[in-house]
Regions:
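Transmembrane helical elements of multi-pass membrane transporters/channels
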Residues: 1-10, 111, 145, 174-178, ...
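Hydrophobic transmembrane alpha-helices of multi-pass small-molecule transporters
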Residues: 34-37, 149-153, 179-183
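Short alpha-helical transmembrane segments in multi-pass integral membrane proteins
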Residues: 50-117, 159-213
């Protein structure tokens, strides 16, 4: 709910800048979502493996699963961040983005896409808190991040007049704060690292991928379908109003 609220707030605030800014951010987020699917494979599988081992009284193995998920998502996140930051313009041109949206979408994709590793790490630490029963603490990180996002959006848009760059910067800062909060809470509240149970890392990783891949595949199919829809809509006009209308509708629906 709070992630959806964040998107709605960004859209409403950007609408005060221009409709094309809304369309540019909506288009960029669609393609960021495709890359983020990779993180879901590990995080969803990691949650299942951690839950199984906590239920079986093996918190040490649950900690191992967290560590494996953290390393895998961190490496994948850094790689995707570099790709999106360096090749943002080429990616958007390859998907036939409307010329009127290109500059704003490229700016957003460079900044937010370049910080995709945050999207890779936040679910790892949030899930770690939730499976050990600290659901409220995970929520605190999300709420604080959203509040900071709203405040920074207001400052960057209406005081500094940074437009799309301001919204992108606010998004990255708020996610960084969210990550710091959930990571710190996990380190303070959960002592699973001290438990003696251990398992072969290769076996745990195989379990994570085996469970996570099917659950992420459904989301992957949906997101890929959305990218084709957005591409077709961009090809239908040069001013990007079709994808702008879609961005508004997606936030309202």
């Amino acid at each position: 709910l709070f992630y959806m609220l964040s998107g709605m707030v960004d859209t409403l605030m950007l609408s005060s800048v221009s409709d094309q800014a809304v369309g540019a951010v909506g288009t960029a987020n669609t393609y960021i979502g495709v890359f983020i699917i990779m993180f879901g494979v590990i995080s969803s599988g990691m949650v299942a493996v951690m839950s199984q081992n906590i239920g079986a009284g093996r918190p040490g193995i649950a900690y191992q699963a967290r560590q494996l998920g953290l390393v895998f998502n961190a490496l994948t996140g850094i790689l995707i961040s570099v790709v999106l930051a360096v090749f943002s313009g080429g990616i958007l041109r390859a998907v036939s983005i409307a010329p009127a949206l290109l500059e704003s979408a490229e700016t957003y994709l460079k900044i937010v896409g370049g910080a995709s590793f945050l999207n890779a790490l936040i679910p790892i630490f949030s899930s770690y808190l939730r499976v050990f029963g600290y659901t409220k603490h995970s929520l605190i990180g999300t709420v604080v991040g959203n509040v900071i996002n709203i405040i920074l959006n207001s400052v960057f848009l209406f005081v500094f007049h940074w437009g799309v760059m301001g919204v992108a910067t606010a998004t990255v800062i708020s996610k960084a704060v969210n990550l710091i909060i959930v990571a710190a809470m996990g380190a303070v509240l959960i002592k699973a690292k001290q438990s003696p149970e251990r398992e072969q890392p290769r076996r745990i990783l195989a379990q994570i991928v085996k469970i996570g891949f099917p659950s992420a595949f459904e989301t992957a199919l949906y997101n890929v379908a959305m990218t084709f829809i957005v591409r077709f809509m961009n090809q239908m006009d040069t001013d990007g109003m079709n994808v702008t209308a879609r961005s508004y509708a997606m936030q309202i629906a």
